Amino acid sequence: MKQYTATANDDGVRLSRFVQSVTRDFPTSLLYKSFRNKRVKVNGKKAAPEYRLQAGDLIELYINDEFFPPEGAKPAPKAAPKRQPKQPKVTVIYEDENIAVLYKPTHLLCHSDRTGDANLVDAFTQYLAEKGEYDPHGENRFKPGICNRLDRGTEGLVIAAKSYAALRDMNEIIRNDLLKKEYYTITVGVPQSGRFTAWWEHVEKNNKVSIHAHQSQDERRKQIITDVDVLRTAGPFALCKIGLVTGRTHQIRAHLAYLGRPVLGDIKYGNRKMNERTGTKTQALCAVRISFLEISEESTLHYLSGKVIKLKDPQIVKQFDALDKNKAEPDKGASHAEN
């Protein structure tokens, strides 16, 4: 029999998931058989697989030792990339006991991928480990994670969670649309200010999205709504504030391209000639503001209600200031503002 005491990072974790995290090569069929046969108990009583743990719960597992790692053994590591990159120092914009809001620079991945390049999750984990807030070797049930991702070529604010409860509740906030994000972008051509609607469709073949004026007959497309506010203009360019009413993959980049005013530097959806003429090699898009609406009092993150977090002096404004107004003229494009 093995005993465990639920920690703060286990708070809210489904019991079946906890059991899977502390066992090794334990078949799912045996997992649920153990629950039926009362071989999994919490605080001395039979517990269901869907039970949500609370910090301090005593978990007793009457499971054969062969399904547990040897005493003192570290959790089996995930397959490591061929090279171990040096993780960058994280820039913290806001931090409390549950979350941190980080600045992600252009070209830094949010999550690890097969390239093995540095990424924000590992950099944040290293940051917490150095502060003594996380033990990567002693904790095998939770790893700090980020709650909203940005494309590799996009810079700006990213929310990171320090605990499972914070990650769970922040994801719930995002699902319930209680988190609003604003971006700055530089467009090729000056768009109209206003609210724009269209229909979004993902094209798996080339990992792009296509934007359309109407829903498809098979109703596979999803409606997108994007707010555009032109802040400044400089010849053929505009510095715009973008608000996302909906949040789809590549929504800002693809929607602005559909409107004929693509993001400067965007390789996938942008104006290649203008990118080359200006020497812009990455998309001019930055997440600059996060604001929270009213959050349920039951949430561990209720205290964030009404809070606004901003990126001060974003680099994209300096990039706009430096643009040469006379380098090129934009391609003509139609605008589809909603009246």
Which residues fall in each region the model found?
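RNA pseudouridine synthases
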Residues: 1-339
